Amino acid sequence: MPTQAAEGWFGNNKSAVLGTYEDKRRINLMNENFSYKMKLTDEEKEILHGSKGEVMAKVMKTLVLYGDAFGAERFVPVNGKGHLVTSFGISVLKPVFSIMDELIKGGLKVDEGFTVDPRPIDYANVKCNPLQKLIFNKILYGMQDSYEVQLNKLGLKSDKSFTCACYFDEVGNTPKKGDILSWAESSAVVFANSVLGARCNRNSGIIELFGSILGKVPEFDLLTDEGRKAKWIIEVKTTKIPEAQVLGSAIGMKVMEDVPYVKGLDKWIGTELTDDA
């Protein structure tokens, strides 16, 4: 996302929570020449034109553009808790922090709460000398504290919600089969789809936050019955358990964006989730 996008996101940086007449007029002008292919409900059209404020209108507009790009025809409700991939307070993410500030000023948050990927450094378990801590805290991740304030204002579940594996019981963000999710973390998306039977596309960072705030996501690809059908059958015939990274890379390079069905791993890892898996 270009840095200048942070200045007003799509232009004007004024926030409207309730939507005065002038707010709605400005939003209507902003979206006057905005054409899209998705079929929106009357309520969704009203949101796009400012019924829930200018910032929510921008969220809706972004998701409509996202849906159009992938051929989605409609929105579907999100019924699982959110999970964010962006967890580092690193300076190159300043545009992200500015967008989050705008969401907060607009009074928006994730009502159901969300989890987020791990913090950059685990000082309790990874020992660092004073110089290393200084570099990490002041230079590399100098915006971590202020970013976590933003996360809390937007609906972070708790201080224990930093993990890539949000689906574990102790974290409390375990989707059910058939749940529609708005996630971006690649490993969690794969686990949710393949193990838990939930439905989630590999969204990009911030897009997944927008979907959780709106409570809806564009319906395409892995959210549809057709999009979940495997186009490849991959049979693993190696004499010993393959390295996960090598196997995943080999399959990915072959199938690209298609859905594979992988056979032959159960003789090593079984069919149940255990520590050995």
Residue ranges of each PLM-predicted region?
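Non-transmembrane, aqueous-exposed alpha-helical and coiled segments at domain scale
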Residues: 13, 17-277
